[in-house]
Structures are given as C-alpha cells and as structure tokens.
C-alpha cells in the first residue's frame, strides 16, 4: 500500500511540474527508484498513455506519441493566439513548432543538436523559403504531401503568406506567431526567447536526444523537411 501511495504522489507531482529531480526532490526521486514503486507507476503509464523517463538524475513525464490525455489539445493551442484564433492558427503553429525542432536537432554528427540558438529573423527567412516553394506545387502534389504527413499544408501556406513580418497595431504577424509558439514551448519548460534568439532548455535537449528522435513519426517528419517535402 505504501508503494502505491508513493507512486500516486510521484505521478501527481509529475502532472503538476513535468519532472522530478534528484537535486530538488531527493525523497521522491529516491522513492521512484524502488522496484515496487516503478511497477505501480507502470499502471499509470498504461492508463494515461505516457512514459516516465529517467535521465541525468531527473524523471520526466512524457506524453505518448498518440496520447490524447496528457498532450495539449487544439483548444489549448488556440488560447496562445488570441480570442479570434481558429484551428487554422493551430495548424500553422504545429508546422512552425516542428520546423523549430528540425532546425535544432537535425545534425548528422554524433550529437544531433546542431545549434545553440535560432535567430527569429533567420527562422522567418527559412519559413518564407519553404512556404514559397510549397505554394508552387501542383494541387495533386500538395494533396499527396498532406495525406502522407498528416499536415494541413494548404492552410499553413495561406496564413503564413498573408502575414506581415511585424506591425505595431496588428496582433497577428509572423513575429508574433513565432513568439506564441515559443510561449507554448516555454510553458512546457522546453524553450525560451532571449533577445530575439530561440534557445532550448536542458529538458528538451535530453528528451529529443534520448527519446523523440527515435520515434518513427519524428523521423519521418525530419526526413520530409530534409528532402524539402514540407
């Protein structure tokens, strides 16, 4: 019974904070290492479609690739883009988020992380290039890419190409769209912005290197970006 109580407490803290570190929560971290507690936590992993990963003396709660219980839902994403935001804004934010991860973690060397930061101006230029190229595709080609990768490219192209880079009075611009995406990442303790530079956290570096880059869907998306299909 005590092992189950410990498991419940650990899972509650992970739901609230996303991680438990040996340095800051030594008692909980020590309890997590007990075999009986981990067996109890396995039940939570199955029920909530998530994974508990222990790297560098820190336990992370990670939603499963197909989880609808712990991962963010479209409505939560929309809240970052203002009261008039629609699902179209969500589709574009997904694309930008995936491309940011590609820019950071598509290295071919032993360490897949290829840069410490991304300038917002650089990101805008790269997205401009990609959407301009995608806009020139025949409808059949675009439809095929959308079906293959599960991404609403036509909507992403339409919204991005009609945005100004920045504007004093407009709430929706390319810069503000990117800032909102970074806000999402920052709230998940994955990335942050400093002087128009996007930087990743230790948490994101660990999860990408040790977990997400090995996932089939992430590999397929990364390869599609590499080939210019997205």
Features from the language model and the residues they span:
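Eukaryotic partner-binding/assembly regions in large regulatory complexes
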Residues: 1-106
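Short acidic, hydrophobic short linear motifs in intrinsically disordered regions
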Residues: 21-28, 113-127, 135-140, 147-166
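Short amphipathic alpha-helical interaction segments
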Residues: 33-40, 170-187
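A short, conserved structural fragment
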Residues: 45-55, 182-197
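Minor-groove-contacting beta-hairpin "wing" of winged helix-turn-helix DNA-binding domains
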Residues: 59-62, 197-203
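Positively charged, polyanion-binding regions of nucleic-acid-associated proteins
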Residues: 88-126, 143
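Eukaryote-specific, cytoplasm-facing alpha-helical/coiled-coil scaffolding segments in long proteins
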Residues: 120-130, 208-213
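Short, amphipathic alpha-helical interaction segments positioned at domain boundaries
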Residues: 163-166, 187, 205-230
